[in-house]
Swiss-Prot record:
Record's keyword terms, sorted: Cytoplasm, DNA-binding, Transcription, Transcription regulation
NCBIfam families registered for this protein in UniProt: PRK00110.1, PRK12378.1, YebC/PmpR family DNA-binding transcriptional regulator
Family membership noted in the UniProt record: Belongs to the TACO1 family.
GO MF annotation list: DNA binding
Record GO cellular component, one term: cytosol
One GO BP: regulation of DNA-templated transcription
Protein name per its UniProtKB record: Probable transcriptional regulatory protein Tlet_1011
Localization terms from the record: Cytoplasm
Alphabetical list of HAMAP family matching this protein: Transcrip_reg_TACO1
């Protein structure tokens, strides 16, 4: 069985490879601006900014663009003022959605969000309606081809403070508390692993979807991720691996 994690990995790779790379840059720049505004322009003391810089570099964003975005966040350069907003929603099949947006116009974003949700069989929920389903966690991803000895990686991650390791898929997924995220990542990198790290919202319970509901939820997630104002979408669906692959293949035709 697979769920949101597998879909997110596929989506991440696709955005980094295809014509949507410019949209990926737009989202990364917004994250850099807000991270610098909230915690200052020094990545050594601002872990959110450090993570944003790493993601921008992984996407091959030019250094000049990264530096300009940080300066816009700290106020050294003029720029658009972005606001971080969390939206909660329901998707087809009763799937819970936790949506993080960075916007310069919250009325526009809410209107566009309602339109996208309605078009794909979803709806906005009241604040708190689905938020309780998700836990804020640190997530570290290590490509499977880097892991010669899974047991060694597991022990190293646990000793460094990891809470859980899922080694069934690619990449290997390591869960930490938000506070331990960077220290675990740094320990892995010190031992030769190339790891991606970030904050995620992990569901405490999941909903199984099949058939038309499965098609609708993947189409909805795709449409939400395509919104410029939406940074991240978290959900709690589970789906058969083969069914997900078939639906995604059909969507990409």
């Amino acid at each position: 069985m697979s769920g949101h994690n597998k879909w997110a990995n596929i989506k991440h790779r696709k955005m980094a490879q295809d014509a949507k790379k410019s949209q990926l840059f737009t989202k990364l720049i917004r994250e850099l601006i807000v991270a610098a505004r909230e915690g200052g322009g020094d990545p050594e003391t601002n872990s959110r900014l450090r993570t944003a810089i790493e993601k921008a570099k992984e996407a091959n964003m030019p250094r000049e663009n990264i530096e300009k975005a940080i300066k816009r966040g700290t106020g050294e350069l003029e720029g658009v003022e972005y606001q971080e907003i969390i939206y909660e929603a329901y998707g087809p099949g009763g799937v819970a959605l936790y949506i993080r947006a960075l916007t310069d116009n919250k009325n526009r974003t809410a209107q566009e969000l309602r339109h996208v949700l309605s078009r794909h069989g979803g709806s906005l929920a009241d604040l708190g309606a689905v938020g309780w389903i998700f836990e804020r966690k640190g997530i570290i991803s290590v490509p499977r081809d880097q892991v010669a000895n899974v047991e060694e990686l597991v022990m190293m991650a646990i000793d460094a403070g990891a809470e859980d390791i899922d080694d069934q898929d690619d990449p290997v997924r390591i869960t930490t508390s938000p506070d331990n995220l960077m220290s675990v990542k740094e320990e892995l990198e010190k031992n030769g692993y190339k790891a991606e790290a970030g904050i995620s919202y992990v569901p405490k319970n999941t909903v199984q979807v099949t058939g038309k509901d499965a098609e609708k939820i993947l189409a909805l997630l795709n449409a939400l991720e395509d919104m410029d104002d939406v940074q991240d979408v978290y959900s709690n669906f589970e789906m058969d691996d083969a069914e997900m692959e078939a639906i995604l293949s059909q969507m990409n035709q």
